[in-house]
Amino acid sequence: MSTSSRALAAYRNALRATKVAFGEDVRMLVAARKAMRHGMLAPDASLPVEDQITHMNDIATFLRRNLVQGKKVSGKDDVYQLRIHEETELGDNATIKETKTTLASQGGGCCGGGKDLYK
């Protein structure tokens, strides 16, 4: 497959991902597609074409799996309905229970109050 056809396939993949991610939110759908179109018409010359194609496919994957939109429920304060679709990646949050290894967590955080929090 030639480079131009792979670039076009990546662009179409990203356009389909915007439809999945933004659904009926026309304002965000149009803005995302406009940004992608601008990136295709004026690509970053500092990146090789192969990296640009990979980046576009990575964007499409991110939009499909990680982006969730919320819509405020009318008549209820601070209540939002999340639009989780079949391609949304749902994690089990198992890593939250693991002991932190950052310098801040070892020293107890910024104020020292969480010294024994993760033990």
UniProtKB/Swiss-Prot annotation:
It comes from the Eukaryota. Its main location: mitochondrion. It is found in: Mitochondrion matrix. This is Mitochondrial zinc maintenance protein 1, mitochondrial. Belongs to the complex I LYR family. MZM1 subfamily. Assembly factor required for Rieske Fe-S protein RIP1 incorporation into the cytochrome b-c1 (CIII) complex. Functions as a chaperone, binding to this subunit within the mitochondrial matrix and stabilizing it prior to its translocation and insertion into the late CIII dimeric intermediate within the mitochondrial inner membrane. Modulates the mitochondrial matrix zinc pool. InterPro entries: Complex1_LYR_LYRM7, MZM1/LYRM7. Interacts with RIP1. The lineage of its organism: Eukaryota, Fungi, Dikarya, Ascomycota, Saccharomycotina. GO terms for cellular component: mitochondrial matrix. GO terms for molecular function: protein folding chaperone. Keywords: Chaperone, Mitochondrion, Transit peptide. Residues 1-15 form a transit peptide. GO terms for biological process: mitochondrial respiratory chain complex III assembly.
